[in-house]
From Swiss-Prot:
One of its GO terms (molecular function) is DNA-binding transcription factor activity. Gene3D superfamilies: NAC domain. This is NAC domain-containing protein 82. Residues 183-198 are annotated as: PEST-like. Keywords: DNA-binding, Nucleus, Repeat, Transcription, Transcription regulation. Residues 333-449 are annotated as: 9 X 13 AA tandem repeat of L-[QH]-D-[LH]-T-[AS]-P-[FL]-N-[PH]-QTG. Residues 162-195, 416-489 are annotated as: Disordered. Its main location: nucleus. It is found in: Nucleus. Residues 171-183 have a biased composition (Basic and acidic residues).
Length: 489
């Protein structure tokens, strides 16, 4: 932080509680300070006359504040090392407590600088108050509180304390003579004042009249009226004498001509500075203005808003008003009892519907493409209607497992098992895979991968039929031959 220079009378003057509970505590805990007014300096490495130049605040006061890290004299001890290169700081008196709401929050120790070697050093006028934190909450949390102390350094006048001693900077008028000269307050002999918008000007009347106060309770300054002044205004204005304020009428002239403060209220006086015809284009009472290109609102009579509406009393009292015909955006409560189009995402899950019409069809199951169907009845996928004579199509994955069907027609065929290509077949009876019809006179073809009869290892197969010419009449299936050629175990 750069050093800050304060005007005369402004100084950093915290109380003991503020030094301990705010500045020192936040420094120990590593928290940010709103104002970085205390420099961190190891004061025991410097001589007292060198420390004032290290302060952040250049107020010229004879009291300086520093954050000082604690350095122990011995590594295993608790005593602090307070020796400098040319002298040492010696404790004097007893520690004083810092009380906050009758609770001890810190301790103050007074030290005096001695020039030379201990214990024969020469006492000087440099005094330091060392503030340390003593917080019970931090003690219970085992937070170290001796990492930093606040040192307040000052130089007293002569030996011993002085009652009412002040350590503010001695005021020297020549130090402030080169500051920017502001406009002086007009005297009673010259009641006029020049108003220059380009400078910071304070307008004031000499008499203690309330009329010279602005809306914030202070003097009228250029900050209140600078926004109202034209940028090119260079005309000076003359303020009336306070004695003539009561008899001076309110003026509606622009601010560049006359500035007055009548009626003890500057807010109204500033509003009177404007010309309503030029500054504000408002509407007068009951006045309608015409602006080209802007359509003016139509002013209707009290009952005029009902013009053009039909007579509701003559209309039929029915509940079927076709307000929006053939509109999918229009929805009534009665529509919730029937399924809607699946594309809208609204449907009645308790009833099937025809996906092509979007209407409920109690005779047909749901369309398999919508994922909504009646699992209790099959349907023809081409028509979308229920067909009790046919099972579900195997392509849809929905079928009646209690009956086979012809995959080419999609209709139930009670005389034929399921097609093996579909993976759906009747395991209780064989069938001819070429015809798709049940053939009770022949076993299954072993090349199809279907169930093989135990007799299939010894019969002659000819296009899906038995060939009885290969065995004798008494043993048409060749059981004797199979037993004769049975390998030995």
């Amino acid at each position: 932080m750069g050093k800050t220079q304060l005007a005369p009378g402004f100084r950093f003057h915290p109380t003991d509680v503020e030094l301990v509970r705010y500045y020192l505590k936040r420094k120990i805990l590593g928290k940010k300070l709103l104002v970085d007014a205390i420099a961190e300096v190891d004061i025991y490495k410097f001589e007292p006359p060198d420390l004032p130049d290290m302060s952040f605040i250049r107020s010229g006061d004879l009291k300086w504040h520093f954050f000082c890290p604690r350095e122990k004299k011995y590594a295993s001890g608790v005593r602090a090392n307070r020796a400098t290169e040319c002298g040492y700081w010696k404790t004097t008196g007893k520690e004083r407590p810092v009380l906050c709401n009758s609770e001890v929050v810190g301790k103050i120790k007074t030290l005096v600088y001695h020039f030379g070697k201990s214990p024969r050093g020469e006492r000087t006028d440099w005094v330091m108050h060392e503030y340390r934190l003593d917080d019970k909450v931090l003690t219970q949390m085992n937070v170290p509180q001796d990492t930093y102390v606040v040192c307040v350094l000052f130089k007293k006048d002569g030996p011993g304390p002085r009652n009412g001693a002040q350590y503010g900077a001695p005021f020297k008028e020549e130090d402030w003579s080169d500051e920017e000269v502001r406009t002086d307050v007009p005297s009673t002999s010259n009641p006029t004042n020049l108003l220059e918008p380009s400078k910071e000007t304070t307008l004031a009347l000499t008499a203690p009249d309330d009329s010279n106060k602005d809306c914030f309770g202070g003097m009228i300054s250029e900050s209140c009226v600078s926004d109202f002044l034209p940028a090119t205004t260079n005309t000076t204005s003359e303020l009336p004498h306070p004695s003539d304020a009561a008899t001076t009428p309110m003026s509606t002239a622009p601010l560049a001509e006359t500035v007055q403060t009548p009626n003890n209220d500057d807010l109204y006086s500033m509003l009177d500075l404007f010309d309503d015809d030029e500054e504000f284009l408002g509407f007068n009472n009951n006045e309608v203005r015409y602006d080209p290109g802007v359509s003016a609102p139509v002013c209707l009579e009290e009952e005029g808003i009902f013009n053009g509406l039909p007579e509701l009393s003559s209309m039929p009292r029915t509940a079927s008003y076709d307000l929006v015909e053939n509109s999918e955006l229009y929805l009534e409560l009665q529509d919730l009892t029937a399924p809607l189009n699946p594309q809208t995402g609204l449907q009645d899950l308790t009833a099937p519907f025809n996906p092509q019409t979007g209407l409920q069809d109690l005779t047909a199951p749901f369309n398999h493409q919508t994922g909504l169907q009646d699992h209790t009845a099959p349907f023809n996928p081409q028509t979308g209607l229920q067909d009790h004579t046919a099972p579900f199509n195997h392509q849809t994955g929905l079928q009646d497992l209690t009956a086979p069907f012809n995959p080419q027609t999609g209709l139930q065929d009670l005389t034929a098992p399921f097609n093996p290509q579909t993976g759906l077949h009747d395991l209780t009876s064989p069938f001819n895979p070429q015809t798709g019809l049940q053939d009770l006179t022949a076993p299954l073809n072993p090349q199809t991968g279907n169930r093989n009869d135990p007799r299939s290892s010894s019969f002659l197969y000819n296009q899906g039929h038995f060939d009885f010419s290969g065995g004798n009449d008494d043993d048409p299936y060749g059981f004797s031959a199979s037993m004769r050629h049975r390998p030995k175990m």
